[in-house]
Amino acid sequence: MKKRAISALLVIIISFTALSGRLYYISSSADFVSVQPHIRVRELGTKKGTIYDRNGSPLTNTESKTILCAKPTTKNSVLVSSLKGKKFAKSTILKGYFTSFFIEDSKSVTQNDDTRCFEIFERYSDNVALHILGYTDIDGNGVTGIEKYYQNEISKHNGSLSVAYSADALGRMLIGEAVEVRDDNYYSKGGIMLTLDRKIQIITENALKNGKIDKGAAVVLDVESSAILACASTPIYERDNIEKHLDSPDSPFLNRAIESFPVGSVFKPVTAAAALESNITLSEYNCIGYIEKSGNNFKCNKTEGHGNIDFNTAIAMSCNPYFIEYSTQAGAKKLLKTAKALGFGKRIDLGNDFITPSGSLPTTEELNSAAAVGNLGFGQGKLTASPLQIAACFATIANGGIYNEPYLYKGEIDKNGNLTPTIQNDGKRVLSKSTCRTIKNAMAKTTTEGTGTGAYTSLFDSCTKTATAQSGQYDENGVEIKYCWFVGFFPIEKPRYVICILKENGSSGGTDGAPVFKEISENIYINDMN
């Protein structure tokens, strides 16, 4: 009896094992289809919030690729057969799988429920405003520039695009099932708006390239508000090949538009403003080629001297002794007060901790002699500033004496493309209108008769100033590195734009910067006329 029971149990166990094996074989077979469908999700693309210029033109997500999504149908197998280089897709479709791939021209595809095309955005398609926009890491996190400091505002408008469909256990799409498109804010217009003008930015970058400013910068500001319209730096780097540039001696990651450099003669209008605001009359002066202060001789850029010159000629020809003399008359306290009021020695807050270097300005204690004051008076000594700071200073002169801190962020764009603007701080009067008028008249002569004639154009009149600043730094050949500046505004009658150009290790402000100023200003003028 016991043996019979054991035998029966063995028969049951063997039968169950055989049945289990058969079921496993059947379920593993390609002929078996699960009655329970699986939802497959295929991500087509992700997108960060868009960065726009002041006119609503995108600075990111400017270009796109077309991706084709095809269900496994006979018609689609014929379709993909006609597409160059897509043989793999036909094989995929014939096996019953949903497929997607990029194509060059969506016009060649008739779209329907079985075949859909989608535009997939590329974050960066060019290098416009490279240094100010910055770049992101592989995970999309901002590393530098606007991408870093405004990441939270941008990320609020991130989106993704995917498709979902029913498939069997092997991933093959179920016949007759629809494809669900999941648009999670992907085609939203949301993002942020900057004060940059894409057209002016491109004009500025092209001018730097054409002017062979291989290491330098250019800034364009709106005269009335100091809104940053263009901000360019050279050399540039490749966003998709960061490692290549990490050890470059030219420091391509440095945004020279906001970094500080020796200033030189573009400080002379500040000295003039300090004297005029102190009710000192800027009279004629006899330049003999040098001036002595506290036992120190300071040379003029013209060895034999300029002779008797008035203020307009002193600005136009950039006479050093003239401004050394009037800086000592104005005094250290007034000179420093005026410089600070015009933005020297102060950091510029571009929002969200995007703060630029302050540059350097000597203290009152350091200006303890006529020689020290005179040295500052023509832009030398412990004085550095950025192209952005210099541009803001001259915007103040151009608009009649109101200093506005430069700004870059205009506000947030919602998903429908509507702007919620930020409130900008009111400017502050720091110079009288008469002081600005006197300086503007002198700067006009720089363009027509002085060191800035290379910027002259028949299209309009401009006010300009040049500088060639000593650095105390030397290249491998023992030649001192010069920082060459050119700054000005136009048109004279009602100034709208201020432009500041810097070239590192150049020849002179007039030689290097004037042609660049001319190209930028003429193209902006022509653009405004169209």
Set out the residue ranges of the language-model regions:
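Periplasmic/cell-envelope proteins involved in peptidoglycan metabolism and beta-lactam response
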Residues: 1-243, 283, 333-341, 502, ...
